[in-house]
Amino acid sequence: MSESHVKISRTIIRGTSPSTVRLESRVRELEDLLDLERDARVRAERNANEMSIQLDTMAERLDELSGTSSQTHDAIRRKDMEISKLRKDLENANAAFETAEATLRRKHNTMISEISSEVENLQKQKGRAEKDKSQLMLEIDNVLGQLDGALKAKASAESKLEGLDSQLTRLKALTDDLQRQMADANSAKSRLAAENFELVRVNQEYEAQVVTFSKTKAALESQLDDLKRAMDEDARNRLSLQTQLSSLQMDYDNLQARYEEEAEAAGNLRNQVAKFNADMAALKTRLERELMAKTEEFEELKRKLTVRITELEDMAEHERTRANNLEKTKVKLTLEIKDLQAENEALAAENGELTHRAKQAENLANELQRRIDEMTVEINTLNSANSALEADNMRLKGQVGDLTDRIANLDRENRQLGDQLKETKSALRDANRRLTDLEALRSQLEAERDNLASALHDAEEALKEMEAKYVASQNALNHLKSEMEQRLREKDEELENLRKSTTRTIEELTTTISEMEVRFKSDMSRLKKKYEATISELEVQLDVANKANVNLNRENKTLAQRVQELQAALEDERRAREAAESNLQVSERKRIALASEVEEIRSQLELSDRARKNAESELNDANGRISELTLSVNTLTNDKRRLEGDIGVMQGDLDEAVNARKAAEDRADRLNAEVLRLADELRQEQENYKRAETLRKQLEIEIREITVKLEEAEAFATREGRRMVQKLQNRVRELEAELDGEIRRAKEAFANARKYERQFKELQTQSEDDKRMILELQDLLDKTQIKMKAYKRQLEEQEEVSQLTMSKYRKAQQQIEEAEHRADMAERTITIKRTIGGPGSRAVSVVREINSVSRGNRATSIM
């Protein structure tokens, strides 16, 4: 259910399919039946010709018998004239005749009782045979129905086997695809593991960079606070200069206040520097040294203020103009500081987004690792399932080879059984013909027995008439005694002549009777030999049939075991196919999920690229603004150096801010390098994914093309199979029509044969009537002791022959009943085994056909 690879291929059955093979085998069987019917018709025509020849011979014999009957009538007329002369002989023969008559009556009565009992037994056996025949016909109908069911089951099993072969090829293709997918998945797994390791390292670097960003952010915020305080100090310095223009004392007081404010600012700076992390320790120490230098400079300024008061008075007017300029620059710087604060807030928001994205990337990496582990487990399970499927595939290939060998052996055995069936059918036909001959002979013997009985009855009536005539004649003799005594002397010579003539006629009759006895004995011996030969042949045929029945039972058992093994193999294959389909569905779902995940990762990478580009643009803008600020700060520091030493302190602060900015720029450069490296890696990953997508699409296109080709091939195979099936069905119909015609002609031949048989029986009855008339005449003539002894001897011989034939008949009937009993037992065991083991094979149908044919023939022979 049947012939059936790491290449996506599929075997297509071309030529004759199993259904066409079955139809061709059916056609061959019908042709064999047609040949058998033709042979039977030829034999029937031959039998009809033989019967016509026998009819002609019987007609000739009837003509001869009619001629002999006319001669016997003439002889009877002569004998009637001589009866009166034989009365004295009759008186002497009466005593012996009466004793023989009594013995014959007793024997006749016993024979009639035995024959009647045998007839009743035969009628009972006939009734039983008819019942058995009806039961056998019902059983044959049931067996034929079961045979049709078995053939349908066999056809369905073969179609299932073909479907399983196609599924096996599909599973092989799927296993090849799964192996390739497993190799791709293994390579993707290794690549993803390396990429995961790289992403983990990059994530760690991102986290370190985030920490450094947070630290630089805190440093920048502290620097911005310092700048704010420096601007406030500049404003206070300007106010102090204005007050110094009014009064040196006020300037001194202001300078003292500035000193105190600078001391407070230095304390605040120390507190802020103390908040820096371990990475900014050098910066803290440098700031502390600079603050100490500032304090020393402020002390030197305090000492030099008295010296420079005069110079400041000269420069006051000039400084007013400079103050106005500084006011303008202050406004600009405040605006720029506000912009920087807004940019700082935007950078902080972007930093938060980057940290959130880093966390998402970390979660995604964990999820990918988990999915990679799941895929490794699934790949291992698929590998084990693939190995199991390959083992099942090899096992199924071996089973398919064994099945092909077994099918070839079964075909050979079916051919042998078909030949044996033909031989047994021909032997059964010969046996039926011989049985019909035996039945005809039996009917002939029964007719002869009836003739003898009627002749005996006629003889008894003739004896009674003769007794009456004897009494009358005795009275007449007493009356005519005197006259006869006178005439006796005259008639002595005539009596002697008559005695001589009667002796001659009696001798002729005895010779004819002896010839008839010899002919009868030869016929009986010939029939006896013929019956013995037929019985021996029937015994040999029964032995052959029993041996064939035993062999067929053995083959039935082996076939039932084979069918069970095939069913188990089909069930295992079905379970393996379902498991492979479920695994394929699971792998398909996982592939779809991985594709969706890759799409999500791609979208996230695109978002991260856009965010990186935005951050780079914003960083460039910030760098430009910082460069502008450095220029403005440099100008301010130059002005401050020319103004006062405290402006130099502010310039030092600005230098520190510039150094921090440079460090931030270095960090930004490193981040840009990391971002570029990540972009390259993402680009490579995208290229790998694109290559995988193109490969997958190519494989899908190839699979679609292969499926289209397979569908076209299947459609072509189905069209060709349907065409062949229709052709074979038409051929089967033609053969069935020819078979019906042959059957009809055979029926006509059988009808003609029956008609000839009826005509032959009518002629036989006529000849028997003639024989009976002849026997009556002979019985009337043959009144002597010699004739009675001849009858007695014939009756005894016929009794012996009938007893022998009846004993042989009973023995043959007993053997037939035993054979039928054995056949019934074998059929019951076969039906039991068939109900236990499922649908049988063709050998079982052959055995049942043999049994049904043999039983039908036996039933017809018994009838």
From Swiss-Prot:
Homodimer or monomer in secreted form. Disulfide bonds: none annotated. Residues 19-836 form a coiled coil. Its main location: cytoplasm. It is found in: Cytoplasm, Myofibril; Secreted. Keywords: Coiled coil, Cytoplasm, Motor protein, Muscle protein, Myosin, Secreted, Thick filament. This is Paramyosin. It comes from Taenia solium. It holds the Pfam family Myosin_tail_1. The gene is PMY. The keyword Coiled coil applies. Residues 1-18, 837-863 are annotated as: Nonhelical region. Paramyosin is a major structural component of many thick filaments isolated from invertebrate muscles. It is a prominent antigen in human cysticercosis, may have a role as a modulator of the host immune response. It is able to bind collagen and has complement inhibitor activity. Belongs to the paramyosin family. It comes from the Eukaryota. One of its GO terms (cellular component) is extracellular region. InterPro entries: Myosin_tail, XRCC4-like_C. SUPFAM superfamilies: Myosin rod fragments (SSF90257), Tropomyosin (SSF57997).
